[in-house]
Amino acid sequence: MEFLEYLTPITSHQWGIGSVFLLISIPLIVTRLLTTFWSWRELSAANQKAPGQKRGPTRPTTIPLIGHIVSFLLDGPGFLYNTARYYGRGIPVRVHLATFPSYVISGPELVSAFLKDSTRSLTPMKRSLNYMEHAFGCPHDLVKSFATSDDKDMEQQIHSALQNMLSGPRLGILSERYQQSVKSQVLSVDAGIGDEWVELPDLCTFVETHVFQAATRTIFGPSIVDLNPTLAKDFWNFNKRVKTMFLGIPAWANRTAIRARDDMTEDIKRWQRHAEKNCNIDEIPEDVEWEEYYGSKSTRIRQQLLTKRGITNESARAAENLSMMWATNANSIPAACWFLLQTLHDPLLQARVRKELDAVRIHDTEETNKAAAFKFDITGLTESPLCQSVYAEVLRLGVAAMIVREPTHDNLALGDWKFKKDEFISVPTNNELMDPDFWNSGTPKDPHPLDKFWADRFLVHPDDPQSGPRKDAKKQKAKSDGKPYFSMDGCTWNWIPYGGGAHLCPGRNFAKREIMLTSAIMLTAFDIELLTDTLPKHDKSLFGFGTLPPIGKAPCRIRRRQL
């Protein structure tokens, strides 16, 4: 009797746990079964429709009400990679990411049609306005000021200001100033690197801090940096938390991120007030390409166009300036860090890269500081085969953005598929950048998996028909000198770190120069030895918004290099 009494509480306790388990698991199982049935029903219905009339199925889910957001937050790249293959590439699959339902599309036919947007029927406007408000801090009642207006000429002028800054002669002027600014910053007394070895706890923190300041001085002028001693720290703190604001997490549940954004907008407002007080922007001569209050001519023009558009509220202007600052730093600087880390990690690659850099390095006769008496032929640098291949591979491996558009009219056809007005359509760039059916992954004797860095992936060796970026590489005409050369032939709709087609990033040419010049200057100005055999991983927590920065530290020792 006593034995049975002893067992009773245990049995009751076990049944209690079992009941809780059943209460939790039954809704999950039922949800999975129902959504799987419905998904297959949608796919079956699509297969019976004519081309141009098919509707994509919804991916099954397990958790009721909240959709796929948990899977996305746990492993965004893996979730979207598997989504694209759930029914096979080329079939759009609908997912629900909290307040953001979207069709995920993949495959060359759909992706090229989406990016080309030949009928100009896709727009990023709604998401852009969402980002302007929630991520960059534009007041809610003013955010529509940034929407397309009836003043088409004004829209064209704003777009033209960006295009002119980042292409043609102005690109060359801006790139030369950037080169000088980075050199001055990293070789300054404040940087703390001399002729003797010093140890840094993290190479990337050094690069992020000093290159951000150099880039910001180039684009916005020196005042914004001088007025805000913590600007670099504030920016990277904001960048670390920006994803939660992009996703629209309510402010009451996201106070740390909101504080980080507010720190940045206050820094920018301080600069705006200083510039307005000390400089009459309308009196600056048209031919002045750069001055100390507003920096580049493009920044100055953008401020004038905002005024003409009626956007005079300082918070709204600070939001626009923060969006520009984020766009010009948050992707290119982490990419430069990866260029450096991958090069320094491989002594043979480092020697090959430095050989190319030496070939395009010239003596800077105007520089009085002997350690900085060098500069690069920027055209020669950006055409260097190996350096270009390293650059392209860094972006292929590290960029994980979501290109999001929505149809401007009902029944938009992309390939065989139909989309309704205002439905979000997304291309996760890493799905195409990591496509095993497209990219060259080496040979059985010399494999180079797509999730591993391969410096030569974009080089064509004339004597090796299996070289080059594509798995199905066609025989390419060899150059007369017989040397390896950089190639992107046939990669237009797979190598898409900058998007493509109608909405190709206008800053891509300057970003390439930022990444390559930063890396070239660091490798030329300094001897750098990594103090770890293992490189950091990509920070997948920032998936969806551009270049994934390193997570963890890369300790090193560094000294000025004797040229």
Curated annotation (Swiss-Prot):
Q: In which pathway does it act?
A: Secondary metabolite biosynthesis; terpenoid biosynthesis
User: Is the keyword Magnesium assigned to this protein?
Assistant: no
Question: Does the entry feature the keyword Transcription regulation, yes or no?
Answer: no
Subcellular location, principal: membrane
Positions the record marks as coiled coil are none
Q: Which GO terms describe its molecular function?
A: heme binding; iron ion binding; oxidoreductase activity, acting on paired donors, with incorporation or reduction of molecular oxygen; steroid hydroxylase activity
Query: What is this enzyme's EC?
Result: 1.-.-.-
Subcellular location, record wording: Membrane
Keywords noted in UniProt: Heme, Iron, Membrane, Metal-binding, Monooxygenase, Oxidoreductase, Transmembrane, Transmembrane helix
Residues annotated for heme binding in this entry: C505
Q: Which family does it belong to?
A: Belongs to the cytochrome P450 family.
Q: What does this protein do?
A: Cytochrome P450 monooxygenase; part of the gene cluster that mediates the biosynthesis of enfumafungin, a glycosylated fernene-type triterpenoid with potent antifungal activity, mediated by its interaction with beta-1,3-glucan synthase and the fungal cell wall. The pathway begins with the terpene cyclase-glycosyl transferase fusion protein that most likely uses 2,3-oxidosqualene as substrate and catalyzes glycosylation immediately after cyclization.
* Protein's recorded name: Cytochrome P450 monooxygenase efuG
Q: Which organism is it from?
A: Hormonema carpetanum
